[in-house]
Amino acid sequence: MTVLSTNALAGKVVLVSGGTQGVGAAAARTAARCGAEAVVVTGRRPEVAEGLVDELDALGTEPLFVRADVAVVEQAVASVTETISAFGRVDCVVNAAALTDRGTLLDTTPEMFDAHVATNLRGPFFIMQAAVRDMLRREAGGTIVNVISISAYTGSAILAPYAASKGGLASLTRNAAHAHRGDRIRVNGLNIGWTATEGEDVTQRRFHGAQDGWLEEAGRDLPAGRLGDPGEIADMIVYLLSDGSGVVTGSVIDWDQTVMGGQG
């Protein structure tokens, strides 16, 4: 289900990096439901993408899976060039791929730091670069949404490299929006909070020893009584991609159950 119009993205070619699971997959489904002409999803594992591609096809869009690790610049750029090769253009981009391994200021290795920057910042940078070049070439404008994180503000102590990389992506979002505000290219971002995704389940079990039922237990301590839902985030992503969001650009919207600066 989506609260958006079924033609919100009519005729648009949408590229979703990290689009085979979690928030990325939800955004791909919502884009298809909202009339996108084509939805391209990227990921590292074709077997994970198979079912999603079938879903997208059933929703009436033309789906395409591009195998790509956004941490590798050549593969990140290739996801854009393959989209253009298949459909002639890229109108909308969602950068949803992310790495969330744990590391503090004291125990993060150079390799871990570089891995976070490569996936969470460098990959989106060069995807945006390639997409914006196509948009400028066609003088057609376009929209980009970067899936950032509430950790871009501070983050917990065990998320030092993650917070640093996401803080960089928030700044990049505003910088790109400012640079191309005169080209009808809008760039926005979402600082998403704790969300119930497949990846979060793996993270909780791998790093925190979580057991079955952890999701419900964690939700009881939150204002809404639950974690965020990927489908809700997808609605906001597609809204920001669509003409319905008007002239909005350079906005990084907090999508969380906490209020920055709130006390007591």
Positions of predicted regions on the chain:
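Short C-terminal tail/terminal secondary-structure segment
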Residues: T2-S5, T154, V238, T249-G264
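Short, small/polar-rich loop/turn modules that mediate ligand/substrate recognition or access, typified
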Residues: V94, R181, R186, V248-G250
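Conserved glycine-rich cofactor-binding loop
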Residues: T20-Q21
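Active-site helix of classical SDR
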Residues: M128, S165, T173
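Alpha-helical segment proximal to the catalytic Tyr-Lys
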Residues: R133, H178-G182, G246
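Residue(s) in the substrate-gating loop at a strand-loop-helix junction
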Residues: S149
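Substrate-binding pocket helix/loop in short-chain dehydrogenase/reductase
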Residues: T104-L105, M112-V117, A218
